[in-house]
Amino acid sequence: MVVKDNLRTPIVCVMGHVDHGKTSLLDMIRGSAVVSGEAGAITQHIGATEVPISAIVEKCGNPGLLDKFMVPGLLFIDTPGHHAFTTLRSRGGALADLAVVIVDINEGFKPQTIESLNILQQHKTPFVVVANKIDKIHGWNPQKGAPFMTSYNKQSEHVRGSLDTKFYEVVGELYNHGFSSDRYDRVNDFQHNIGVIPISAITGEGIPDLLMVLLGLAQRFLESNLHYNAEGPGVGTVLEVKEERGLGTTLDLILYDGVLKKGDTIVVGCLGEPIQTKVRAVLKPRALSEINVEDKFKQVSKVTAAVGVKISAPHLDGALSGGSVRVATAETLDAVVEEVRNEIEDVQIDTDQSGITIKADTIGSLEALVNELKKEDIPIRKANVGDISNRDIMEAFAIEDPFHSVIVGFNVNILPDAKEKVRSTGVKVFMNDVIYRLIDDYRDWVKEQRAISEKAVSETIVKPAMFTIMPDCVFRQSKPAVVGVRVIGGTIKTKVDVATGDGTVVGIVKGLQSRGENVSVATIGMEVAMSIEGPTVGRQINEGDILHANIPERHVKILEQELYDSLSADELEALDSFLDIKRRDNPFWAK
């Protein structure tokens, strides 16, 4: 076996939509070689599962492969989903070296599938796609744990045809999102094409192929990134901050470089000044054979990258998920503190003067949320990690723009004392664990609120209208004048002033009748009887005249600045015609 001593295990994250099989896949990988005492057995870490090269080769049934690979195995992050991917960040990008995007072959792409692809593309992370649940294809004959082609060749022609159709629908969806892909065994260049592996996370079919493709990708594209310093100071990323009985606040972290020992001084990233503390205990999970032992962790004196581990230390309150953990010596302490401080500052989001407030559970997910909001041109006034607090509510409440008096929370809760404030202030709070859904919910709400406010404004505003007095349709000359009119633009209502072609206001619309019935409005094309209080036909108004609804100057400004997009083409024509009249003598009228 040609494993290089200074190559660490590549870190793999499994991403995809809810219920598409992320957890089942991790369970299958975990369970595939968890046999007590077996050589090359899978090792359970804190928050991760290590599959050594020997177990992968054995699963593939080809011992000759052992000499072809230099990486020691694969380290799968146990928390599935893009949440884990964004949490596990290293300086300048994602910590995961490789990703597996899982998609249900029978359901195709869903919002989280697309979100996962976007995040991977953003971080330039190599990935494969697994088309899961092939065992659910009608008529499928399962071959437990078999490589995909072995299983595929044992299916009937009809079932193979059904799989091929569904498979190429997945390939088509990848193409629609800008990725060229094909079945993994037909891909020659993984740098430019995505390998798609049909699998069943329940029967284990295709799992050997997946592990082999991941090893190949690691070997091909990552070897230069996997070198680590076996004696150097440990560097890791916090996966989770947890309270453990008897231990207090602990950190679950992935150590991706160097060594971490009990008694080491560490610097931990937080929103304020970095935490400086000493490692009290380094903990690993007990083997499955020791599961009855009351204490589920065992203490070790040191660990070497790449490894998932729990540490206990004083003063860890305030440590950030996704934050950095670095080992420091007396000589390097100041420099390490500065480095960790800079990492957190790198993530401080560029905010706008006015905008919404966003909260997320980790630095990485905050970055992901900010990126998506920026793409949608949604301004952000404040972005922070943590649950929604009383202060967040009060700050959002103080914002004048109702569309910005909003808090968007990704994977967070509202603190108990803040819940009452949400009710009393009316601040709008959106919460979800899918970024797409959060953005859609916010946009839909804005659209709905705009429509409501436009309707309210619109109902109090005099709208543009243009109408002509039809020939031979004078029913009464005055007190009030009653004439037949045709609406040639916009909407005319009762109680609106009437202006002539030179802008003179001559009266007010008292009533409208259509086919003998009283109506309150008349729209373009309608011919109605109109009673106008004020003018006399033959003096101020005449047959054939084109008249306008007289729009007050303040209303014109609202129409032009706030409601312009909601006006129809004929309303715009009527408005332009009215403005031409009013601005003949005063070009700055209503400007």
Curated annotation (Swiss-Prot):
The keyword Membrane does not apply. Signal peptide: none annotated. The keyword GTP-binding applies. Function in general translation initiation by promoting the binding of the formylmethionine-tRNA to ribosomes. Seems to function along with eIF-2. Residues 16-23 are annotated as: G1. One of its GO terms (molecular function) is GTP binding. PROSITE patterns: G_TR_2 (PS51722). Residues 7-223 form the tr-type G domain. InterPro entries: EFTU-type, P-loop_NTPase, Small_GTP-bd, T_Tr_GTP-bd_dom, TF_aIF-2_arc, TIF_IF2, TIF_IF2_dom3, TIF_IF2_dom3_sf. Residues 78-81 are annotated as: G3. PANTHER family: EUKARYOTIC TRANSLATION INITIATION FACTOR 5B (PTHR43381:SF4), TRANSLATION INITIATION FACTOR IF-2-RELATED (PTHR43381). Residues 41-45 are annotated as: G2. NCBIfam families: aIF-2, PRK04004.1, PRK14845.1, small_GTP. GTP binds at residues 16-23, 78-82, 132-135. Belongs to the TRAFAC class translation factor GTPase superfamily. Classic translation factor GTPase family. IF-2 subfamily. GO terms for cellular component: cytoplasm. Residues 200-202 are annotated as: G5. Residues 132-135 are annotated as: G4. Keywords: GTP-binding, Initiation factor, Nucleotide-binding, Protein biosynthesis. This is Probable translation initiation factor IF-2.
